[in-house]
Amino acid sequence: MTEKLPLALFLMGPTASGKTDLAIRLRQKYPVEIISVDSALIYKDMDIGTAKPDAGELALAPHRLIDILDPSEAYSAADFRRDAISEMNKIVAEGKIPLLVGGTMLYYKALLEGLSPLPAADQEIRKQIEAESIEQGWQALHDQLREIDPVSAERIHPNDPQRLSRALEVYRISGKTLTELTQTKGDSLPFRVKQFAIAPKERKELHRRIELRFEKMIEAGFEDEMKALYAREDLHPELPSIRCVGYRQMWDYLDGNCDLDEAVFRGVCATRQLAKRQITWLRSWDDLTWLDSENIEQALETLSDAIASD
């Protein structure tokens, strides 16, 4: 008889949809342990602008995979998959259920489907590409990518240096294009996954929550948090940490490119766009149960039933 795979729960959703509150309430009721699935919460010293759970919330419900990196460091979907599976196995060994909570859809996809066998980052080649970008401009590098990998060039915008650099780096390391390599899937996830997504039914309610959240961030000292990061000589706006929504716009403000009101406006707009992308991902997601942000009791009951019926 085949041994039953361990249960894991995914709680996905757009930014500001109430995922964290729901996860904390579920943990108070059931033996679940929370793993964060968020490419911004991984960074230390980035608490306010990421809406990281506060000390009180973390005391009630510790989150794994937050505050694990300095903002100067990069973290890939492959890094996340390795770390998340390690934490999931530890949680199961403790006799508990992994509850993965967040909105970084690429991380969930990597976890479920595995990853293509892409080469590890090569700092020397990255520096070489960065030097070329300064000398020739990103458009010239995009033209280069179009010649070797037109499919990736169609997908990657010339103003997206992070992805453009990675596509060129992969080719220079391996001699194969990103398109070739991503057609090969990795290992699937050795868990039985029940997947849920939470969001308000009305888009205007999500927009209201996003605006309110940004206002609260400013009141809580987001500008001072940003100034501390801006003062560091090892940080710059091309880093994944500073490219996070909100941080990118506040960096522009500190650079003198706009005033604070404009930075807040841009930050809210960028957050709305992020939420729209997250919802687009989720609408095409298979085997997903939707929960209503405005009916937390019902959402909690649905999650409770999923655990109790297993």
From Swiss-Prot:
**Location of region: Interaction with substrate tRNA:** 38-41, 162-166, 243-248, 276-283
Q: Which sites bind substrate?
A: 15-20
Q: Which residues bind ATP?
A: 13-20
Please name the InterPro entries in this protein's record: Dimethylallyltransferase, IPT, P-loop_NTPase
GO molecular-function terms, A-Z:
ATP binding; tRNA dimethylallyltransferase activity
Cofactor(s) this protein cannot do without: Mg(2+)
Q: Which domain of life is it from?
A: Bacteria
Keyword Hydrolase in the entry? The reply is no
- Site location (Interaction with substrate tRNA): 104, 126
Q: Could you say which EC number(s) this protein's record lists?
A: 2.5.1.75
Identify the keywords attached in UniProt to this record, alphabetized.
ATP-binding, Magnesium, Nucleotide-binding, Transferase, tRNA processing
In the UniProt record, does the keyword Transferase occur? yes
Record field: catalytic activity: adenosine(37) in tRNA + dimethylallyl diphosphate = N(6)-dimethylallyladenosine(37) in tRNA + diphosphate
Which SUPFAM superfamilies does the UniProt entry name for this protein?
P-loop containing nucleoside triphosphate hydrolases (SSF52540)
> Which is a Pfam family this sequence falls into?
IPPT
The Gene Ontology biological process annotation of the record reads: tRNA modification
Q: What is the annotated role of this protein in its UniProt record? A: Catalyzes the transfer of a dimethylallyl group onto the adenine at position 37 in tRNAs that read codons beginning with uridine, leading to the formation of N6-(dimethylallyl)adenosine (i(6)A).
* Oligomeric form and interacting partners: Monomer.
Record family assignment: Belongs to the IPP transferase family.
Q: Output this protein's name.
A: tRNA dimethylallyltransferase
Q: What organism does the UniProt record list as the source?
A: Vibrio atlanticus (strain LGP32) (Vibrio splendidus (strain Mel32))
